[in-house]
């Protein structure tokens, strides 16, 4: 239920951002606002149900001073509807809309050792060509894969790791015996 509500809020803000042709600005600003709101001291006040809504709204105006009125007002609407605890989920849903709008995908690149920039660029180029999307690589080091690469694209895993090859070989050997 909370995800559905977060999607509605994100969609509403995204529609406004598109109409104003400020999708990137709204995304960056919402990301920064949520980062500030999630700092421990601010978060305790922001989600505290015993604090009056009007006091919270005033607090948000002070904490988000310098942010656009649209983002501040959006956060205030979330407060007025008692949805402040969903602000991170709203950002996640907005980010999904943002990435779809700009034809982007995230790809986790798992390797046994840190990859050089040239290798990452080559992987990015190949994936952008294959998926016809802008690729954002998220490099992760996991020594357990021993070598090779493992790519995670959404729910798809492309496992070219040495560990996976050894496990497949072991499985084949067991079946042969």
Curated annotation (Swiss-Prot):
Family membership: Belongs to the ATPase delta chain family.
Quaternary data: F-type ATPases have 2 components, F(1) - the catalytic core - and F(0) - the membrane proton channel. F(1) has five subunits: alpha(3), beta(3), gamma(1), delta(1), epsilon(1). F(0) has three main subunits: a(1), b(2) and c(10-14). The alpha and beta chains form an alternating ring which encloses part of the gamma chain. F(1) is attached to F(0) by a central stalk formed by the gamma and epsilon chains, while a peripheral stalk is formed by the delta and b chains.
Lineage summary: Bacteria, Bacillati, Bacillota, Clostridia, Thermoanaerobacterales
Subcellular location: Cell membrane
Cellular component aspect of the GO annotation: plasma membrane; proton-transporting ATP synthase complex
The keyword Signal appears for this protein: no
Gene3D superfamilies assigned to the protein according to its UniProt record, in alphabetical order: N-terminal domain of the delta subunit of the F1F0-ATP synthase
Chief site of localization: membrane
Function: F(1)F(0) ATP synthase produces ATP from ADP in the presence of a proton or sodium gradient. F-type ATPases consist of two structural domains, F(1) containing the extramembraneous catalytic core and F(0) containing the membrane proton channel, linked together by a central stalk and a peripheral stalk. During catalysis, ATP synthesis in the catalytic domain of F(1) is coupled via a rotary mechanism of the central stalk subunits to proton translocation.
Gene Ontology MF: a single term: proton-transporting ATP synthase activity, rotational mechanism
UniProt protein name: ATP synthase subunit delta
Keyword annotations: ATP synthesis, Cell membrane, CF(1), Hydrogen ion transport, Ion transport, Membrane, Transport
Topology in membrane: Peripheral membrane protein
The species this protein was found in: Caldanaerobacter subterraneus subsp. tengcongensis (strain DSM 15242 / JCM 11007 / NBRC 100824 / MB4) (Thermoanaerobacter tengcongensis)
Keyword Chaperone belongs to the record: no
């Amino acid at each position: 239920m909370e995800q559905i509500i977060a999607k509605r809020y994100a969609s509403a803000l995204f529609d406004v951002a598109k109409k104003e042709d400020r999708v990137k600005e709204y995304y960056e600003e919402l990301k920064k606002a949520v980062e500030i709101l999630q700092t421990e001291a601010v978060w305790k006040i922001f989600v505290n149900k015993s604090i009056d809504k009007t006091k919270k709204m005033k607090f948000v105006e002070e904490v988000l001073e310098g942010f656009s009125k649209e983002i501040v007002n959006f956060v205030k609407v979330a407060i007025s509807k008692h949805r402040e605890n969903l602000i991170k989920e709203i950002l996640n849903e907005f980010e999904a809309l943002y990435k779809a709008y700009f034809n982007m995908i995230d790809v986790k690149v798992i390797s046994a050792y840190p990859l050089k920039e040239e290798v990452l660029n080559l992987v990015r180029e190949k994936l952008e060509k294959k998926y016809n999307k802008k690729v954002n690589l998220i490099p992760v080091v996991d020594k357990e894969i021993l070598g090779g690469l493992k790519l995670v694209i959404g729910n798809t895993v492309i496992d070219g790791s040495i560990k996976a090859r050894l496990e497949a070989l072991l499985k084949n050997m067991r079946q042969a015996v």
